[in-house]
């Protein structure tokens, strides 16, 4: 339905962003992998999108790389996995790292991603192993880096909670990852990388 958007970044606070396309603001939910590389507010961006309509909601998801959108869609084909876990996957690891985990059958590494337990990880390996090599295909669209938000520590805590971490755990992870002057995307990236170790 809506496959791609090109417009101006009008708002961004993980996991939400608004892209202004000729005066219409499209609100999208995006994984941290996209937020890491978004241009600053007021700059142009092109996003691959995934439109989802359910009985009680309509959602639009945005991705800088086609491979991320493909992985988002494929992960949701696994029984018991929805958009929230698919976003957590893309927020926790790169497409290439996920493909390696699935191809290697690394259940332990997969269970470090929020929302994925042992049985879900086993289903992912079983159902996605044949397609894992295709996940990395699809390049990035050109982008810049964004400015630091007013309070990167609290924004990172909120983003980690939305990825499935409990409030106390999200706050601890953000505090441990935070260094003065860090942008919110950097804090979240360091927190997620630390959690996966």
Swiss-Prot record:
It comes from the Bacteria. GO terms for molecular function: ATP binding; four-way junction DNA binding; four-way junction helicase activity. Residues 65-143 are annotated as: Domain II. SUPFAM superfamilies: DNA helicase RuvA subunit, C-terminal domain, Nucleic acid-binding proteins, RuvA domain 2-like. GO terms for cellular component: cytoplasm; Holliday junction helicase complex; Holliday junction resolvase complex. SMART domains: HhH1 (SM00278). The keyword Nucleus does not apply. The RuvA-RuvB-RuvC complex processes Holliday junction (HJ) DNA during genetic recombination and DNA repair, while the RuvA-RuvB complex plays an important role in the rescue of blocked DNA replication forks via replication fork reversal (RFR). RuvA specifically binds to HJ cruciform DNA, conferring on it an open structure. The RuvB hexamer acts as an ATP-dependent pump, pulling dsDNA into and through the RuvAB complex. HJ branch migration allows RuvC to scan DNA until it finds its consensus sequence, where it cleaves and resolves the cruciform DNA. NCBIfam families: ruvA. Has three domains with a flexible linker between the domains II and III and assumes an 'L' shape. Domain III is highly mobile and contacts RuvB. Belongs to the RuvA family. This is Holliday junction branch migration complex subunit RuvA. It comes from Stenotrophomonas maltophilia (strain R551-3).
């Amino acid at each position: 339905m809506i496959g791609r958007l090109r417009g101006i970044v009008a708002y961004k606070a993980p996991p939400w962003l608004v892209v202004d396309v000729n005066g219409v603001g499209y609100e999208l939910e995006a994984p941290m992998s996209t937020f890491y590389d978004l241009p600053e507010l007021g700059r142009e961006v092109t996003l691959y999108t995934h439109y989802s309509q359910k009985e009680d909601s309509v959602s639009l998801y945005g991705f800088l790389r086609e491979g991320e959108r493909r992985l988002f869609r494929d992960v949701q084909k696994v029984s018991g996995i929805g958009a929230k876990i698919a976003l957590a996957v893309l927020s926790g690891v790169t497409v290439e790292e996920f493909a390696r985990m699935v191809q290697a059958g690394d259940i332990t590494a997969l269970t470090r991603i929020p929302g994925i337990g042992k049985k879900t990880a086993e289903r992912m390996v079983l159902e996605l192993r044949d397609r894992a090599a295709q996940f990395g295909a699809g390049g990035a669209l050109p982008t810049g880096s964004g400015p630091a938000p007013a309070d990167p520590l609290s924004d990172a805590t909120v983003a980690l909670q939305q990825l499935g971490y409990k409030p106390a755990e999200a706050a601890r992870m953000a505090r441990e990852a935070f260094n003065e002057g860090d942008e919110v995307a950097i804090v979240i990236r360091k927190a997620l990388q630390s959690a996966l170790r």
